[in-house]
Structures are given as structure tokens and as C-alpha cells.
């Protein structure tokens, strides 16, 4: 059973996150291992496994990027285990330049420049995310997979910038 079916949702990028949360809570209560503590070892083990599946499905579907990756996996694009990389050299060069800029910001400890950098990277991420949503809506699975690969780069860059911001604020 796929994660969307588990939560009673359509296999789509656009999901009702409130319904997802409510269904998660219901499933948690229904399959919590403690409810099977007095049952057989097999029942307890089955509850533990089901609970783990529910938690994994919840974590996957609640985050936009992992939800997109999972949806793509249902259409034959298993991005989680693939070794395929981004082949767009212009994008890769841009990422290299951005990484160098972030390193320079770290060396100079320039808060204002970091704030501007974070906003710029967030805008780039949001633009790509909207592009991916359009591609998913149009069932352009291959194009969406390429965009997700690029979003991963931007997400890691965004995370690195946020970590640097925390580091600079600690001073």
C-alpha cells in the first residue's frame, strides 16, 4: 500500500495537510504498539512495524520536497536511491558560485550580506518549487525529477546558510 492510500489521500502533490495530520493521529492511536503490549509477540511486532510505516509515511508526505520525491517514485523515478546527478552545467556552476559566496560570507562574518544571500536563495528555491509543482500537475515526471534534483541542491544550500546564520548569531 502506498503512503497516499494509507492516509486516504489522492496520489497527488496537492494534499490536504490538515486531513493528513488528522489521519496520522488516528492511525497512531489505532496502531500504537502499547495497545498490543498484552497481545502475542507477533501482534506486537506487527504493530511496531505498522507504526514505523505510518511514521515514515507521515514524514514523507508532510514535507513538500519529500512528498514530490515519493510521488515521482510512484511514477518510476526513484530519486532516493538513484545515482543520477544534475547534468545542467550552468546550474552546477551557479551552485559552485553560491557555495563560494557563502564561504566568503562565513569568513567575513557579514550578517547583512548573509541575510541578503538567504533571501536570494529562498527566492530561487520558491521559483524552482513552483516550476516543479507545474511539472507535476502536467504529469511531466522526467522534468519534475530534474527539478527536484535541483531543489535538493538549493535545499542543502539553504540549510547551510541557516546554520551559518545560527553560528554567527551565537557570537
Swiss-Prot record:
PROSITE patterns: DNAJ_2 (PS50076). One of its GO terms (molecular function) is ATPase activator activity. Residues 2-74 form the J domain. Keywords: Chaperone. Gene3D superfamilies: DnaJ domain, HscB, C-terminal domain. Pfam families: HSCB_C. GO terms for cellular component: iron-sulfur cluster transfer complex. It comes from the Bacteria. InterPro entries: DnaJ_domain, HscB, HscB_C_sf, HscB_oligo_C, J_dom_sf. One of its GO terms (biological process) is protein complex oligomerization. The keyword Nuclease does not apply. Co-chaperone involved in the maturation of iron-sulfur cluster-containing proteins. Seems to help targeting proteins to be folded toward HscA. Interacts with HscA and stimulates its ATPase activity. Interacts with IscU. Belongs to the HscB family. PANTHER family: IRON-SULFUR CLUSTER CO-CHAPERONE PROTEIN HSCB (PTHR14021:SF15). This is Co-chaperone protein HscB. It comes from Salmonella arizonae (strain ATCC BAA-731 / CDC346-86 / RSK2980). The lineage of its organism: Bacteria, Pseudomonadati, Pseudomonadota, Gammaproteobacteria, Enterobacterales. The gene is hscB.
Amino acid at each position: 500500500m502506498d503512503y497516499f492510500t494509507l492516509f486516504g489521500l489522492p496520489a497527488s502533490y496537492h494534499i490536504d495537510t490538515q486531513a493528513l495530520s488528522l489521519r496520522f493521529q488516528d492511525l497512531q492511536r489505532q496502531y500504537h504498539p502499547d495497545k498490543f503490549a498484552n497481545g502475542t509477540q507477533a501482534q506486537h511486532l506487527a504493530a511496531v512495524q505498522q507504526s514505523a510505516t505510518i511514521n515514515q509515511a507521515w514524514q514523507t508526505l508532510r514535507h513538500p520536497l519529500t512528498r514530490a520525491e515519493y510521488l515521482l517514485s510512484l511514477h518510476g523515478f526513484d530519486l532516493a536511491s538513484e545515482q543520477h546527478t544534475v547534468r545542467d552545467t550552468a546550474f552546477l556552476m551557479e551552485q559552485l558560485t553560491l557555495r563560494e559566496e557563502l564561504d566568503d560570507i562565513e569568513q567575513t562574518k557579514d550578517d547583512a550580506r548573509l541575510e541578503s544571500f538567504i533571501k536570494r536563495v529562498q527566492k530561487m528555491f520558491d521559483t524552482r518549487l513552483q516550476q516543479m509543482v507545474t511539472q507535476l500537475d502536467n504529469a511531466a515526471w522526467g522534468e519534475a525529477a530534474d527539478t527536484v534534483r535541483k531543489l535538493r541542491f538549493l535545499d542543502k544550500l539553504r540549510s547551510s546558510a541557516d546554520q551559518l546564520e545560527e553560528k554567527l548569531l551565537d557570537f
